[in-house]
A protein has these predicted regions:
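A domain-start/cap signature at the N-terminus of enzymes
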Residues: 4-72, 149, 153-156, 160-161, ...
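Extracellular/periplasmic catalytic domains that process cell-envelope and extracellular macromolecules
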Residues: 51-53, 67-71, 104-108, 140-141, ...
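Gly/Ser-rich "nucleophile elbow"/oxyanion-hole loop immediately N-terminal to the catalytic nucleophile
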Residues: 65-66, 70, 120-152
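Alpha/beta-hydrolase fold active-site loops
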Residues: 73, 110, 145, 170, ...
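Active-site machinery of serine-nucleophile hydrolases
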Residues: 74, 78-129
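Cell-envelope and extracellular/periplasmic
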Residues: 77-85, 136-141, 151-165, 176-177, ...
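Extracytoplasmic/secreted cell-surface and envelope-processing proteins
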Residues: 85-86, 121-124, 156-159, 179-185
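The feature captures the conserved acid-bearing segment of alpha/beta-hydrolase catalytic domains
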Residues: 170-192
Length: 192
């Protein structure tokens, strides 16, 4: 890392290898969860995805009129340090965060996800990508409208995640944080 937080060539190479290997395994079609007709809507709290890098704690919002036959925008939100996963006592603390709630209150229906990760480094960035892919594969998501937003430590995590997989995200809102990801893959893939 340089003093400005730009990754070394080694970090860029790792991100490129991950992007290439991930893009080979990511399906191109929208798939839904098998029980979509019985799916709970509104805010769904305290979920755990057993991921390749360990458990991913998250909460999400499905529009009240969620329809498996309609493709929805997906917003991946990443809170700052005070809303990260520190054990059961912190479970669901990101639901109180306005960076999650504001997206659920927009007039347009969208799926909103807020992860509670354990750090803001490479592992959490890979978990953020894995969680994004999980929602794309298991919910009715418009793959051309996958967005991300990160604040503070969550901004550091999402800047790395978006740099790892710029093909996954259409746009990224980076707030109150240093940029830890690389710029080139983002510019090359037209991420707004």
């Amino acid at each position: 890392m340089t003093a400005c937080g730009n990754p070394s060539d080694e970090d860029s190479q790792e991100a490129l290898q991950m992007q290439q290997s991930d893009s080979e395994t990511t399906p191109e079609t929208v798939t839904q969860q098998p029980e979509a007709a019985n799916m709970e809507t509104g805010v769904i709290a305290e979920q755990i995805l057993s991921g390749n890098e360990g458990d991913i704690h998250y909460n999400y919002y499905l529009p009240e009129n969620y329809d498996e036959n309609k493709a929805y925008p997906l917003m991946m939100t990443m809170p700052g340090y005070d809303r990260m996963w520190f054990g059961e006592d912190s479970s669901g603390s990101n639901l109180e965060w306005s960076g999650f709630r504001v997206w659920t209150e927009l007039p347009e229906d969208m799926i909103v996800v807020s992860a509670q990760l354990t750090d803001w480094h490479e592992t959490s960035a890979r978990q953020a990508v894995e969680l994004t892919e999980y929602f794309i594969q298991n919910f009715s998501v418009d793959k051309s409208r996958v967005y991300a937003a990160g604040y503070s430590a969550g901004g550091e995590t999402m800047s790395k995640a978006v740099a790892m997989r710029p093909d996954l995200y259409a746009a990224y809102l980076h707030g109150a944080s240093q940029w830890d990801g690389t710029y080139d893959p983002i510019a090359e893939n037209g991420v707004a």
